[in-house]
Regions:
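Conserved active-site alpha-helix within GNAT-family acetyltransferase domains
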Residues: 82, 94, 106-124, 130
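Acetyl-CoA-dependent GNAT
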Residues: 2-67, 72-74, 85-87, 91, ...
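Accessory recognition modules or surfaces
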Residues: 82, 135-137
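Conserved beta-strand-loop-alpha-helix junction that forms the acyl-donor binding cleft
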Residues: 73-76, 102-111, 128-135
């Protein structure tokens, strides 16, 4: 698949049903997914005006944690996940976080490879983290 440039924007209330559907396609969505979408900082990747993925972030002391990062199956291998991750990194730096963290189950080899390939290292059981530069602002 070719690289597709996504427009990344903040979550809007009318995104909830579509993003819940995206989460359902990946690992099954539930009431926790709704809570994440309603309470956390969520950014949506749009391709040609339609949501192609999202990342949900929450503060964890001096770190920013990726709670969910999903890409629509029809947009896999187009760079959408990488763009969302880069956006999450930038947001975390702007919020003065020192680390970006994500919990990944040991059997999720694809996700482990994705994050490790972008510089994340082991920080605990199922926890990966990326040390961030200081914000210059």
């Amino acid at each position: 698949m070719p690289y597709r440039k996504a427009e990344i924007r903040p979550f809007r209330e009318d995104d909830e049903a579509v993003l819940f559907g995206l989460a359902s396609l990946d690992r099954g969505a539930d009431s926790r997914t709704i809570a994440v979408l309603e309470r956390e900082t969520v950014f949506v990747a749009e391709v040609e005006g339609f949501p192609a993925g999202y990342v949900a972030l929450t503060r964890a002391e001096d770190a920013m944690r990726i709670d969910q990062l999903f890409v629509s199956p029809e947009h896999e291998a187009e760079g959408i996940g990488r763009q969302l991750l880069e956006w999450a990194e930038g947001y975390a730096i702007s919020e003065r976080a020192t680390r970006l963290q994500v919990v990944v189950e040991a059997e999720n080899r694809r996700a482990l490879d994705f994050y490790r390939g972008r510089g994340f290292t082991e920080a605990g059981e199922n926890l990966l983290e990326l040390h961030l530069p200081e914000s210059i602002s």
